[in-house]
Structure formats: C-alpha cells, structure tokens
Amino acid sequence: MSATQDAFFMARAIELAKNGLYTTDPNPRVGCVIVRDNTIIGEGWHVKAGQGHAEVEALKTLSDAIGATAYVTLEPCSHHGKTPPCCDALIVAGIKRVVVAMQDPNPLVSGRGLEKLNLAGCEVACGVLEEAASALNRGFISRMTRHRPFVRSKLAMSLDGRTAMASGESQWITSAQARADVQTLRAESSAILTGINTVLADDPFLNARVNVSVVQPIRVILDTHLATPVTAKMASLDGRSLVLTVSSDETKKSILEAVGFEVYQLPFKQGHLDLNAVMHFLAEQQINDVLVEAGAVLNGALLAEDLVDEWVVYMAPCVLGDQGRGLFNMPQLQQMADKKCFTWHDVRHVGPDLKLTLSSASIER
C-alpha cells in the first residue's frame, strides 16, 4: 500500500481517537481502522479506562480480519493491564500488516508491541502521521517521558494586559463565547490547578460544564498554610478535590478531609510549595494534562520555573487602566536580557475576543 493510502487511513484513525478526547483519562486517546482491499471494514476507538482498547473495539465490528491491515494511532500494548494485550488480539485475528502512528512512550510497552507483532509474522510500519497522533496525547507522553503532566495555563486579560480591576473585580473581562471555550479546555484536562488566593477570592467550582460525556477533572488547590475554607464549593462536587500543602497541622488537615478534600503534604522551597515536586506528585496521581486557572502570584511562579508548556490567553477589546491587576507577579527584571519570551502557535477569534496560544520560548513542545 502506498504512503498516501497509509496516511489517508491513519487520518481516519486519528479522527476516531478524538472521540475519546474527554473520557479516556488516565489512558491515551487511541483510534483504529481495519482495511482490506483499500476499503475500511472495521473501526474503533478507546472510550474509557478499563474498557476495550481501540484495536479490540475495531475487531468487534467484523467477523473476519484475516489478511487485513490495522491502522492504529498508538503502538498496540503487549502487556496485561486492566485489559488483555492488543497485540495478541491482532495476531489471533489474522491481521497481516500493522501501521502505527507512533511508538508508545509507556516503558511497559515502548517498542515491545511492535517487536511482538513482527515476531508473529506481521508486517509493521511506524511513524505515519506521528506529529498529529502525538498532539492528541501530549499529556500522556509528558507523564511517561518527563514524569510530569503537560501544563497549560488559561488567562483572561484586557487590551492593556489587566486581569482584574484594582479592587479584584474580574467578572467579566471576556465574552460568554470565550468563557464557553474555557469549558472545553477544562473537559480536555485531567486536573484543574489553582491557588489559595483564587479559592478565597472567587470560590470556584472548577468543573467542566459541557454538553457531552466527560470524565470530570480532578480539582487541585495549592495551599501553603491550609487556609482552604470548609465551605469551598468544590468540596460538594463528585470526584476528587486535592489540597496540596507544606503544613503539618493535623487538625486543619482532618477538618478538610471531613468535608471531602484529600490533603497531601509536599516539600517546600523558600517557604512555599516546591512547584516541581507538585508536578511530579500530580504525575504520580496519573494526571496527564493540567489546566491552570489562577492569579498573578501562581502564574508568575510557574513562569519563573518554566513549568507551563502552553499559555492560552483570551484578550478582550477593552481597557481597565493602569491600576488594574497584571498577568504575572514576578521579581523585577533588571535588564532587557532577562525578559521572558514566548513563541506564537495560534491566534483566532472567539466571539469578540482573541484567543492567543503560546509557549515559553525556553520550553520544547
């Protein structure tokens, strides 16, 4: 089969994988297409952790796969987890050729699946539309290779770079369309991270309000001194709400745990939570993608540590004045050479606002 045909069928597999965009955590999003004589005869995708993987779901849709080609967006697994190995299912079904978009970064798999298929007599090809497939699973890849999640921070600002009035009033700088777009960012995320200042000021729910099936993100508060109120709205929601702290106050911890919070003590650095330790802890919790929704203090600290992989900034066509609050609280930079630089990735309209997508120039995406 030609490279053009391989790319065509892999593109379809990638579209199928997107069906799991909001539901597969902590697993990767994977799609599979089975082809015989240049015709798609079976399709499937991974829906949810613990349920069938994409290859198995595709095989379920047909009675005979002998001699066919399977296009899979991620290397088929070769180990026993919550489900049996997908490699075995493909081999038993009589698949003759397996085309994979990318090798699995999971060290339990990482090349072993391709090797097993090869040894069983399957023709194997890897790297077809790899970049597009990787983009679907940035968080999973980050957790497996960097031992921390892919971190995205959402910011909303005026034309003059202000996030709130001097009083702290911020509802609403951006439009209803921009705020609705944020809900999709939440739905795509494994966790939403905020700081105690935002909790005390806004008391947010930090849930994803979308009209599709979604695994609700884990809510995470960075709270150095355990100041989170027991009345915080997010404690009333289903799912996990975590408070990460440096405090060893067992009384405060017990009070928060009694209303539904999980409280974890982490290392500190210069009197505050060690943000690198936070990211490693979140990876240990099987969190792939983190969305930061916080104020200038936490965003400034994350920027200073180069811990944000992607910045999503909604800019409204309004001006709040020079007394308004800024995007980042950071130590004063002494010279132009110390400036923080970014790389543009996308600019588009969302209603009357602009949605700007950038990464820190010092971080490889």
Annotated model-derived regions:
Residues Q5-D25, R143:
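Short, basic/aromatic recognition patches
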Residues A13, G31, C77, L117, ...:
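Residue-level signal for inorganic ion chemistry
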Residues R29-N38, L155-A156, L356:
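Short beta-strand scaffold segments in enzyme catalytic cores
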Residues I34-A132, I218, D249, L303:
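Zn2+-dependent cytidine deaminase-like catalytic core
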Residues P105-L108, E131-A132, L200, A227-P229, ...:
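Short gly/pro/ser/thr-enriched loop/turn and capping motifs at secondary-structure boundaries
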Residues S142, R148, R152-L159, T163-N288, ...:
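Active-site ligand-binding patch in enzyme domains
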Residues A304-F342:
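Flexible, gly/pro- and Lys/Arg-enriched active-site loops
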Residues P331-R365:
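Conserved histidine-centered catalytic loops in small-molecule metabolism enzymes
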